[in-house]
Amino acid sequence: MSQAFLPFSRPSIGDEEIAAVEQVLRSGWITTGPKNQALEEQFAQYVGSRHAVALSSATGAMHVTLLALGIGPGDEVITPSQTWVSTANMISLLGATPVFVDVDRDTLMTDAARIEAAITPRTKAIIPVHYAGAAFDLDPLYALADKHGIAVIEDAAHAAGTRYKGRHVGSQGTAIFSFHAIKNMTCAEGAMFVTDDEALANRVRMLKFHGLGVDAYDRLTHGRKPQAQVIEPGFKYNLADINAAIALVQLERLDAINARRTELATQYLQKLEGLPVQPLAVPNYPQQHAWHLFILRIDSERCGMDREAFMKGLQEQGIGTGIHFIATHLHTWYRQRAPHLSLPDTEWNSARLCSIPLFPDMTDQDLDRVVGAIEHLMGKRP
C-alpha cells in the first residue's frame, strides 16, 4: 500500500481552535471585535512591544506601515531581494524604489555592511528579513539606522517566537508578523504590526480601516457616534474575530509548536549530515531559531541533479516541497526595471533552494521517510 502524500507544510489545528471559532460564530459578532482586542494585547505582551495592531495580512500591514512612515515617490527603501515579493510590490505601489541588496550565501540574510553600502540621500527605510525562523543580526543594523536617521521595519513574517540575544525580534522597534496558513502560528490569513511608537501605531490602526478614527466595535463599546470621520483615505485591512480567535489559541501553543519544530530541525541536521544537500547555516550570534522553514540547497555539481529533478524525485515518492523564494529582482517586472542588477549570492541560492517538510504535527517516522527519500535520490540507499 502506498503511503499518504506528505506535504511540506500543514497547519496544526485542533479541537481548541475549532471550539474558539464556534464560540465566535455563536456570539453574533464575527468581524473585528473583542477577539482582536485580546489578540493585540496578548501578542504585544508576548513580544515585549508597547503597541500591536492586528491586520488581515502581512502585505496589508507592510502597505500601511510604509504609508504611515511617509514613504512615497522619490524615496528608496533598502531590502534583500531574497524575500517574498509583497515587500517590493508595496514599495513600488507607493511610487518609491526598492533597492535590493545581496545576502550571505549560507544564511540568506543580508547585514549592516551590505545595507550601508546601499544608503543614499533618498533612503527612507530599511526592511531586514528574519529568514526561515532565524534572527537577523539586529544590533549593527539599529546602530546604522540611528546613525543615518533611517526607519527600520523588521520583516518578521517567518519569526513568531524568534529571539535575538534574549529578546523577541520586533521588540526593539517596529515589526510585522504573518499568520498565513504555513506560518508557525496561523489563523489562515492575518498579521500583526508591533511598535513602541504610539503615533505610528495609531496611524497604522486608522489606515487599516478606511482612514476612520474608530471601527464598528470601537463605537459599540465606547458609545461613539456612528458617523465616524475620515481622517485620511485608508484601506480595508482589518482582521475578523473568526481569524483572531484561531490566532489566540495558536499564540498559547506557539512555544510548544516551536519546540517541536526545533526537535525536527535538529534531527534533520543530524541525519542529513554527510549528504551533498546543503542546509542553511545557523547564524553564530546568540538567538533562538523558530525553524519556520527547513531549506536545502541542491547544487547539481554536488548532488548530481538540479533542484527541479530533486523536487520531482521527492514528489514521485509522495513528498511535497516548496521554493522560498525566487529572488524578487529576477521576477519579470523588476528585471525589466533593473536588467543589469547582479546579486551573486542571492541568485546562486534562488536557483538551488528547496524547502522540505517541516511542521509540528510531523512524526519522527515522517521525518525518517523524508531523509530516506533524499538518501535514495543521492544514491545512498537503494
UniProtKB/Swiss-Prot annotation:
Name assigned to this protein: UDP-4-amino-4-deoxy-L-arabinose--oxoglutarate aminotransferase
Cofactor requirements of the protein: pyridoxal 5'-phosphate
Gene3D superfamilies: Aspartate Aminotransferase, domain 1, Type I PLP-dependent aspartate aminotransferase-like (Major domain)
Enzyme Commission no: 2.6.1.87
CDD domains tied to this protein: AHBA_syn (cd00616)
InterPro entries recorded: ArnB_NH2Trfase (IPR022850), DegT/StrS_aminotransferase (IPR000653), PyrdxlP-dep_Trfase (IPR015424), PyrdxlP-dep_Trfase_major (IPR015421), PyrdxlP-dep_Trfase_small (IPR015422)
Modified residues (N6-(pyridoxal phosphate)lysine): K183
Family stated for the protein in its record: Belongs to the DegT/DnrJ/EryC1 family. ArnB subfamily.
Reaction equation(s) it catalyzes: UDP-4-amino-4-deoxy-beta-L-arabinose + 2-oxoglutarate = UDP-beta-L-threo-pentopyranos-4-ulose + L-glutamate
Keyword Transferase: yes
UniProtKB keywords: Aminotransferase, Antibiotic resistance, Lipid A biosynthesis, Lipid biosynthesis, Lipid metabolism, Lipopolysaccharide biosynthesis, Pyridoxal phosphate, Transferase
Gene source species: Pseudomonas fluorescens (strain Pf0-1)
UniProt GO BP: lipid A biosynthetic process; lipopolysaccharide biosynthetic process; response to antibiotic
Pathway(s) the chain acts in: Nucleotide-sugar biosynthesis; UDP-4-deoxy-4-formamido-beta-L-arabinose biosynthesis; UDP-4-deoxy-4-formamido-beta-L-arabinose from UDP-alpha-D-glucuronate: step 2/3; Bacterial outer membrane biogenesis; lipopolysaccharide biosynthesis
Classification via SUPFAM superfamilies: PLP-dependent transferases
Major enzyme class: transferase
Keyword Lipid metabolism recorded: yes
Role, per record: Catalyzes the conversion of UDP-4-keto-arabinose (UDP-Ara4O) to UDP-4-amino-4-deoxy-L-arabinose (UDP-L-Ara4N). The modified arabinose is attached to lipid A and is required for resistance to polymyxin and cationic antimicrobial peptides.
Superkingdom of the source species: Bacteria
MF GO annotations: pyridoxal phosphate binding; UDP-4-amino-4-deoxy-L-arabinose aminotransferase
